[in-house]
Regions:
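Conserved thiamine diphosphate
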Residues: 19-73
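Glycine/aspartate-rich loop-and-adjacent alpha/beta segment that forms the canonical ThDP
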Residues: 57, 63-148
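Acidic, glycine-rich active-site loops and adjacent beta-strand->loop/helix elements
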Residues: 2-9, 56-60, 84-85
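Catalytic or ion-translocation cores adjacent to nucleophile or general acid/base/metal-coordination motifs
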Residues: 1-28
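Noncatalytic linker/hinge segments flanking ATPase motor cores
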Residues: 12-21, 38-46, 93-96, 117-130
Length: 148
């Protein structure tokens, strides 16, 4: 299980390989110039790794299903969990992290999915819905504000 905070959280929110392009973080005050490393795509490219992206605040049932499938899978499994960090500058604080997770999926920033190489038929399941009326740009604008 990888808790993807998109920064090095234990050192004050420094830019990492998981930080999205353009994000402002410590040591990337002008915005990160390189692309975020897509761990899920890398693992899926092997063809034999169970991979899921989850966001518990957006879909608790999908989270539980992904964890159960990963545990039952007879090979390596990788679950990447969207994990808001205090360094994101969540307006109402970390008490609203679950709401932030829900919003990330709602606006299309984060996608919940499962890739199960052992599944019959389609091995990839996109579990999140198409982005709805959320404001993607507003979601991005408030992230990483504490580093300014």
């Amino acid at each position: 299980m990888v808790f993807d905070t998109e920064v090095y959280s234990n050192t004050g929110g420094q830019s990492s390989k998981s930080t999205p392009t353009g994000a402002i973080a410590q040591f990337a005050a002008g915005g990160k110039e390189t692309k975020k490393k897509d761990m899920a795509s890398i693992a899926m490219s092997y063809g034999y790794v169970y991979v899921a992206q989850i966001s518990m605040g957006a879909d608790f049932n999908q989270t539980v299903k992904a964890i159960a499938e990963a545990e039952a899978y007879p090979g390596p499994s990788l679950i990447i969990a969207y994990a808001p960090c205090i360094n994101h500058g969540i307006k109402k604080g970390m008490a609203k992290a679950q709401t932030e997770e829900e919003l990330a999926v709602k606006v299309g920033y984060w996608h919940n999915f499962r890739f199960n190489p052992a599944a019959e038929g389609n091995k990839f399941s996109l579990d999140s819905k198409a982005p709805s009326d959320g404001d993607y740009q507003a979601f991005l604008t408030v992230r990483f504000v504490t580093t300014l």
